[in-house]
């Protein structure tokens, strides 16, 4: 039932205009206001809108049966409804590309270009939370399977097949290229899965920074601060666009892991945001906290 309710149209604003007519509708509004007043915002970076709607379906059942479902505002919210009436195949006409705005490349004057090939610890520690960086040069990749193998090799005292000292690693498993592509879609994966590896990898390899998606947990943040490293956030949900910044790609280690092998990317102006700086300041903590105070002070929720 919880999942079924998420297929209903977004209509919370209509409900707010006409007012609730039942306890369930009252509860929808209460939860909607309470969650948005937290100031969590899009991608957890702070803002007025955290949820777009709250759905509630009730049915006589045991008191312990309280299913809750959440749907992210991504591809999962796009649905097509059609009827199979036996007259033939149900063909879906692709919308015209003209319905979308043109993609523009304007990062603004405040973005800082970073040369990964000459990166120093001092430069890493100068990055500020929320700052936009444009990465250029050689970047390595590695996600779950690669990290597990790296840590296992370190624990056995073995030499890694690739030198991570002074490098930046991107949490990604790129899709295989097609036609004239250098690499397929290469969007960041959720970074918290690498949290348990972070301290050991930073300490024993000399890695400078990591690039991934979403927030880092307390263990990773403490490790980043301890080792004066940084965590950079790439744009989630834009894997194809991120791949346009990758100018060359080759596998350099753990080829048997397929897409989770360690790749060497050469990137050009790859946009990222400083999400955790060398002092352990996380924008996923400061952003929501700042917006929660704004909402409380100005009653703008």
Where are these regions (language model features)?
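Non-transmembrane, aqueous-exposed alpha-helical and coiled segments at domain scale
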Residues: 1-107, 203
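Feature captures the catalytic cores and cofactor-binding loops of soluble hydro-lyases/lyases
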Residues: 5-46, 141-273
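C-terminal binding/interaction regions
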Residues: 40, 46-54, 61-64, 75, ...
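Short, solvent-exposed amphipathic alpha-helical segments in soluble enzyme
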Residues: 69-73, 86-88, 129, 149-152, ...
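Short, structured beta-strand/loop micro-motifs enriched in basic residues and often containing a Trp
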Residues: 109-119
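Residue "hotspots" at secondary-structure boundaries inside conserved domains
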Residues: 122-125, 162
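Short, well-ordered loop/turn sites that connect or cap secondary structure elements
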Residues: 124-127, 133
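Short, charged beta-turn/beta-strand-edge "cap" motif at the junction between a beta-strand
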Residues: 132, 138-142, 278
């Amino acid at each position: 039932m919880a999942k079924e309710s998420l297929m209903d149209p977004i209509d919370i604003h209509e409900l707010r205009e006409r007012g609730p007519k039942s306890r369930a509708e009252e509860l929808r509004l209460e939860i909607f206001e309470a969650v948005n007043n937290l100031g969590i915002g899009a991608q957890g970076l702070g803002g007025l809108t955290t949820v777009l709607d709250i759905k509630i379906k009730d049915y006589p059942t045991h008191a312990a049966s309280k299913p809750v479902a959440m749907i992210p505002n991504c591809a999962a919210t796009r649905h097509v409804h059609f009827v199979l009436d036996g007259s033939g195949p149900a063909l879906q006409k692709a919308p015209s590309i003209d319905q979308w705005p043109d993609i523009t490349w304007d990062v603004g004057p405040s973005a800082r270009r970073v040369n990964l090939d000459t990166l120093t610890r001092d430069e890493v520690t100068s990055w500020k939370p929320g700052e936009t960086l444009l990465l250029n040069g050689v970047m390595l990749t590695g996600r779950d399977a690669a990290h597990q193998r790296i840590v296992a090799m370190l624990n056995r005292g073995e030499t890694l097949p690739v030198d991570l000292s002074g490098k930046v690693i991107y949490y990604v498993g790129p899709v295989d290229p097609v036609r004239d592509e250098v690499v397929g879609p290469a969007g960041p994966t959720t970074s918290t899965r690498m949290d348990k590896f972070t301290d050991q990898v930073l300490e024993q390899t000399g890695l400078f920074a990591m690039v991934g998606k979403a927030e880092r947990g307390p263990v990773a943040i403490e490790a980043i601060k301890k080792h004066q490293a940084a965590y950079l956030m790439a744009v989630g949900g834009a894997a194809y666009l991120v791949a346009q910044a990758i100018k060359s790609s080759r596998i350099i280690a753990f080829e048997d892991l397929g897409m989770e092998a360690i790749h060497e990317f050469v990137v050009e102006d790859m946009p990222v945001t400083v999400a955790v700086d060398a002092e352990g300041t996380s924008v996923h903590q400061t952003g929501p906290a700042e917006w929660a105070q704004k909402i409380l002070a100005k009653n703008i929720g």
